């Protein structure tokens, strides 16, 4: 109902076609109808994104010239890496980014959530990873938070600072599902054995918490030795 210039209203058809790959689509704008053709849901999604991009700068009701677009990627892996370890990205902003990746037909999000500077993903049963590893601020011994780096303020309890924050298990599931609906694969990265200082310090804190109760359990996830 928002497209004219072709004996308004305009009908949109979805059509199957033989394609070069799973993302190959064809978009045809005719006098009184639009056809999006593809061999997979991903292809149809890409065609829809192109149609949306054509409409974005239009006023409503929009007018499109007749056009035929035959499009497919030469590179099947088109990715972006997002580093939320050094500076945290809130979930709402990440979802906006995923929408933009979909608009540009980027199909992989490399999710870098752990590094020396922070650990940003909740792991049930290993609370110190986020209780300590996701916060930076003033500290003498890093028993409650990590040293401040990549300026994010000095207060480990400031939830507005880019130094602090993490994704809960539920947050991460939501991100995965949100991306999947937009045909984006999320590849989470756990940095190891190098660039693992946040996890190392978090597991040292876990060790110190449990060593008086159960030494075997305390050492279970310890990532360092006392002589290191």
Annotate each language-model stretch with its function:
Residues 75-78, 105-107, 180-184:
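Short, well-ordered coil/turn segments that N-cap beta-strands
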Residues 117-181, 196-228:
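Aromatic- and acidic-residue-enriched carbohydrate-binding clefts of CAZyme catalytic domains
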Residues 44, 94, 168, 172:
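Aromatic/hydrophobic pocket-lining residues that form the small-molecule binding cavity
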Residues 1-77:
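Contiguous, structured surface segment used for ligand recognition
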Residues 183-187, 193:
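Long, well-ordered, tryptophan-enriched scaffold segments
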Residues 97, 175, 186:
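Aromatic/hydrophobic pocket-lining residues that form π-stacking "cages" and hydrophobic walls in ligand
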Residues 47, 92-94, 112-113, 120-125, ...:
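Short, solvent-exposed loop/turn and secondary-structure capping segments
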Residues 80-116, 120:
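A conserved hydrophobic secondary-structure block that centers on an alpha-helix together
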């Amino acid at each position: 109902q928002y497209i004219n210039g072709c004996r308004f209203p305009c009908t949109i058809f979805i059509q199957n076609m033989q394609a070069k790959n799973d993302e190959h689509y064809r978009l045809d704008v005719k006098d009184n109808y639009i056809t999006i053709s593809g061999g997979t849901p991903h292809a149809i999604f890409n065609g829809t994104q192109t149609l949306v991009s054509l409409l974005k700068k239009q006023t409503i009701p929009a007018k499109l010239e007749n056009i035929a677009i035959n499009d497919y990627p030469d590179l099947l892996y088109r990715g972006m890496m997002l580093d939320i370890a050094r500076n945290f990205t809130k979930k709402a902003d990440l979802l906006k980014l995923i929408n933009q990746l979909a608009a540009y037909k980027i199909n992989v999000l490399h999710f870098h959530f752990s590094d020396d500077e922070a650990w940003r993903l909740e792991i049930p049963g290993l609370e110190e990873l986020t209780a300590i590893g996701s916060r930076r601020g003033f500290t003498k011994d890093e028993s409650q938070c990590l040293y401040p780096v990549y300026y994010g303020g000095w207060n480990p309890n400031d939830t507005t600072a880019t130094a602090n924050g993490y994704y809960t298990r539920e947050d991460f599931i939501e991100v995965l599902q949100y991306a999947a609906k937009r045909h984006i694969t999320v590849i989470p990265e756990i940095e190891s054995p190098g660039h693992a200082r946040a996890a190392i310090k978090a597991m040292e804190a876990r060790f110190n918490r449990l060593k008086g109760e159960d030494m075997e359990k305390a050492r279970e996830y310890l990532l360092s030795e006392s002589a290191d």
